Amino acid sequence: MESLNALLQGMGLMHLGAGQAIMLLVSLLLLWLAIAKKFEPLLLLPIGFGGLLSNIPEAGMALTALESLLAHHDAGQLAVIAAKLNCAPDVHAIKEALALALPSVQNQMENLAVDMGYTPGVLALFYKVAIGSGVAPLVIFMGVGAMTDFGPLLANPRTLLLGAAAQFGIFATVLGALTLNYFGLIAFTLPQAAAIGIIGGADGPTAIYLSGKLAPELLGAIAVAAYSYMALVPLIQPPIMRALTSEKERKIRMVQLRTVSKREKILFPVVLLLLVALLLPDAAPLLGMFCFGNLMRESGVVERLSDTVQNGLINIVTIFLGLSVGAKLVADKFLQPQTLGILLLGVIAFGIGTAAGVLMAKLLNLCSKNKINPLIGSAGVSAVPMAARVSNKVGLESDAQNFLLMHAMGPNVAGVIGSAIAAGVMLKYVLAM
């Protein structure tokens, strides 16, 4: 009987909590959205599978060595950790003390747990290497740069303003999160509000990079919200675009884009990086990788490197990035009131960014002979190239011969630049406080 009892107690099913069961269902939902509905499958599939692995009871695949120690509830070991942190020797008190401790102290406690015989789970290791270091989002940004054509933006520089206007959704959402906190509805700190706000940029790697720096405890919810809403751009944007434009405005035909020279395309990423990085060094990591990837593409002298970055490298990193985000889909981190706030603020951020881009296009038309179709303003959110395709689709509904795709790629690419700069602004001023 003892052997049978030990066997039963060793089964993960016997230790399955309500929170873990809910998160397993959430992870299955993400897999269904990725496979059946094709919602951002490149990220949602590994994120969903990472969520499954993270919530298997007793497996500990997403736990660090210290978290494994705390889950083991050994009184003697807890007493040693508590003595180092000057707190009560119980799990709750130790977690609170760790949350307030300096990173150096947290690392010291992690090393102490390793010395006691605990090892981090494989997903925790993935997270430390891929996101904790900030490497994975930066490599993906390099790949995105290698796949980006700045031609439409250079051919019509005014569209840079549309991309900039769309970033208004980011800062409006930061204010929204702080407002929720002010009225006591949902508690958000300033770093958490900044990390949530970047969802409005519709740029997954930037959202992961910034939340990993400012609010790693919210990374899972922020990443899921960012990629889910990016997939829902064809549903979120059109009603806003139609509401803010007249039939006449939607029929505006834009002049043919000029041909952009090879020299312009080579110089642009270098000049862009120097201008922005010298003024805002905190934006240099994201924008630097983006511009480097684009320079490899446009220079034409490193085609092998450019091809590797666009295909093999970005695919490999995407796998580990998704699994690493899935490591944060654990019940005690995800099933919080803050998650609902993140999902609500995320969709509001998309809406405000879309509206701001459209309204900026209408404003530019007041002082310009060459009219801009306001529909391309919505492409200022950096969901590349989906937002540009949505602008083209809505335009074709009003005029079947009015093709806006290439025009919309200008603000779409500008949105990528804008979201990277916005992330740099957040890092500079939030971390300085």
From Swiss-Prot:
Belongs to the GcdB/MmdB/OadB family. Catalyzes the decarboxylation of oxaloacetate coupled to Na(+) translocation. GO terms for cellular component: plasma membrane. InterPro entries: OadB_MmdB. Its EC number is 7.2.4.2. It comes from the Bacteria. It is found in: Cell membrane. One of its GO terms (molecular function) is lyase activity. Keywords: Cell membrane, Ion transport, Membrane, Sodium, Sodium transport, Translocase, Transmembrane, Transmembrane helix, Transport. It catalyses: oxaloacetate + 2 Na(+)(in) + H(+) = pyruvate + 2 Na(+)(out) + CO2. The lineage of its organism: Bacteria, Pseudomonadati, Pseudomonadota, Gammaproteobacteria, Enterobacterales. Its cofactor is Na(+). Heterotrimer of an alpha, a beta and a gamma subunit. This is Oxaloacetate decarboxylase beta chain 1. The keyword Cell inner membrane does not apply. The chain crosses the membrane at residues 13-35, 42-64, 125-147, 160-182, 214-236, 266-288, 308-327, 339-361, 413-432. It is a multi-pass membrane protein. One of its GO terms (biological process) is sodium ion transport.
